[in-house]
Each structure stands twice: as structure tokens, then as C-alpha cells.
Design a protein with these regions (language model features):
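Extended, non-catalytic subsegments within catalytic or DNA/protein-binding/adaptor domains
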Residues: 1-333
Length: 333
């Protein structure tokens, strides 16, 4: 529940009431919808924890929050998730007009507990295998024919890897986001996981000579009869780029889902003779970064293309790709 900006009263002027409601909507947009949903779920979990132990959730004492973090860790919750849940608790307190537990005098216990949780319950990163260029081309080769499903699936894989897109970004891509230019294609990403302020970002995809992602996308648009301009309004079309197909392979108006991408990756890596258990929808995004790192692309260019917030995250792909380059034991092993 969001704290009121002003005490509401039916006696307030209607213009002021409308302004307050509008301001509430703006406040609600301060965090990505996925973050708001996660915070709401995290707060409910904390409330259940407090109810079961007959302690107060709001305002919560720092010791209770620290105990919550410990119990979560012993129950198998990942340290990163516990950190987010503590952030959700702090956020809810501030929303309700209370000092956050992490800002109170005895708050040091929370920071120390989180540090201990990270050290004691640290998990090895379970990274999925990247679909680099060679693997992606093997996956594309398994999709035979020129039917709508084959044409669509090839475009999804190629654009997904070429743009280092998240599954959700492929599913939410709209025709109005596409801009074909002489060098290839620019795709607008109105909002992404790392872009909570919704500034939007452009992703440039060259024509290419090997995977040819832009050509494969053009083939899908032509085969499905999709136009970037709405024929009725004359404006850029808000309709989805990648559509669901019926069982008889007819194009629908509904967008694919992120699960569509994940299933497509799994099925094509299996058909290519690869181990599907180590691949996921993220393999397309990871594949671009791993391939770019192997080709010694600029770290900053890679970060800009993948829209990562942290340069360290991108640097991990470079380290993985260069693990055997100039190896310390090369001259004696």
C-alpha cells in the first residue's frame, strides 16, 4: 500500500484530487513492474514469517529482519533473493511512513547477517551454455522448410542472438520498434530489466554475412504479411513482431511468450546433437557476448549492445572466452 501524498478528503477540490491520483501513478512507476511484483511477494513472505512467530512486521525490529534472513538461508533461499527481500522490507516501511529497519540504530545486525549469509550459503553460478555463432548456425540448420513456423523460428533465434536479447524482450517486441536502415536494423527497446527509468535503448543489428539475422527477420515479416505501418491509422504498428501460430501454422495476433523462446532453443539444440540440459533461452544472449569476447570486441561496445548495468557482468564473458589464451602453464604443461 502506497502512503498518501496528502490526507485525502472529499472536501478537497476535484482538480487537486485528480493531481494527487496522477502523482500516485507516477510514484508507482518508480520501479519496474517486475520489481513491484517481487517486492509485494517478498513482503507477504515476511509477514507470514512474523505472524508465525507472533512478532510485529510493521514496524519490524532489525533483529527480526536479521533472524528472517537467517531462517530464509537455512531453508535454501538464495542469498541474492534474501537481499532483495530485505530491500522489499525496507521499501515497504518507507512506503508506510516508517524508518526502514536497515536505517535504525540497531541496523548493523542486518548488514552483518547478510554478509554472513553470502559467505556461508554462497552458490556457484549455474550459467547456461552460450549459443555462439557456430552452435547457432547448427541450430538454424535443423529448422527445415519454408513454412511459417520454420521461417518464424529461424528469425527468433537469429535476432535473439544478434541483439543479445532477453526472452522477454523478444516476446514483447513490436513492429513499431523496428527500423530498417542501410547498414541493417535498429530495434527500439522501450524498457528492459536494467532500464527502470524507461529511457529506452536502441539495438543495432548489422546485415551480417554468416547468420544474416536481418534477412531472416525480413523473410518472417514477408511470409506472415506483417507491415511496420498500420494500414488503418497510417502510424507505426503496435502489433507484436513474433506471433503465436495455430496448430495448422496460421498466424495469430497474439505474441509469443518467453517460454516459446526457451522451448525453441531446447528443441533446436537437441536436434543439433547438443545437450539440451545445459542450454536455455538465455543461451542466445550469452552466445552473442561469448562470441564477441572471443573476437576481442570492445568491452564497452559489448555492454552497450547487451544493455547490462554492470561492466563486471560483461567482463565475466571476456574472462570465460579468454580462459586458455596466453595460459600461465602453456610453456610447461
Amino acid at each position: 500500500m502506497t502512503r498518501d501524498l496528502l490526507p485525502l478528503s472529499p472536501n478537497l477540490p476535484s482538480d487537486l484530487l485528480a493531481e494527487i491520483e496522477g502523482a500516485r501513478d507516477t510514484l508507482a512507476a518508480s520501479k519496474a513492474s517486475s520489481t513491484r511484483k517481487a517486492y509485494a511477494s517478498d513482503w507477504a513472505i515476511f509477514c507470514d514469517f512474523c505472524d508465525a512467530r507472533n512478532v510485529e512486521a510493521l514496524p519490524a525490529h532489525p533483529d527480526i529482519v536479521a533472524l528472517f534472513a537467517h531462517v530464509q538461508a537455512t531453508g535454501g533461499t538464495a542469498p541474492v533473493t534474501i537481499g532483495r527481500r530485505v530491500a522489499a522490507i525496507n521499501h515497504h516501511h518507507k512506503e508506510e511512513g516508517f524508518a526502514s529497519p536497515s536505517a535504525r540504530d540497531a541496523a548493523g545486525v542486518i548488514a552483518h547477517m547478510l554478509s554472513g549469509v553470502r559467505k556461508k550459503y554462497a552458490r556457484k553460478k549455474n550459467q547456461k551454455a552460450p549459443a555462439e555463432a557456430e552452435k547457432l548456425m547448427a541450430m538454424l540448420a535443423t529448422i527445415e522448410g519454408d513454412g511459417l513456423r520454420a521461417v518464424r523460428d529461424r528469425a527468433i533465434l537469429a535476432i535473439g542472438m544478434a541483439g543479445a536479447f532477453r526472452r522477454s524482450e523478444l516476446a514483447s517486441m513490436r513492429l513499431a520498434d523496428l527500423h530498417f536502415v542501410a547498414a541493417g536494423l535498429k530495434i527500439d527497446i522501450p524498457r528492459s530489466k536494467g532500464d527502470q527509468e524507461a529511457k529506452g535503448q536502441d539495438v543495432a543489428i548489422p546485415e551480417g554475412r554468416f547468420i544474416r539475422p536481418v534477412a531472416l527477420l525480413r523473410e518472417w515479416l514477408k511470409a506472415a504479411g506483417l507491415s511496420l505501418i498500420d494500414p488503418v491509422t497510417g502510424k507505426p504498428s503496435p502489433e507484436p513482431v513474433f506471433r503465436r501460430l495455430t496448430r495448422s501454422d496460421l498466424v495469430t495476433s497474439a505474441p509469443i511468450t518467453d517460454k516459446t523462446v526457451a522451448r525453441l532453443v531446447k528443441s533446436t539444440v537437441t536436434a543439433a546433437g547438443l545437450d539440451a540440459s545445459i542450454f536455455s533461452g538465455h543461451s542466445l544472449r550469452a552466445g552473442f557476448l561469448t562470441e564477441a569476447a572471443a573476437k576481442q570486441a570492445s568491452l564497452f561496445k559489448m555492454k552497450g549492445h547487451s544493455r547490462h548495468r554492470s561492466l563486471d557482468t560483461v567482463a565475466d564473458y571476456v574472462r570465460d572466452a579468454a580462459m586458455f589464451d596466453d595460459h600461465a602453464g602453456e610453456k610447461f604443461l
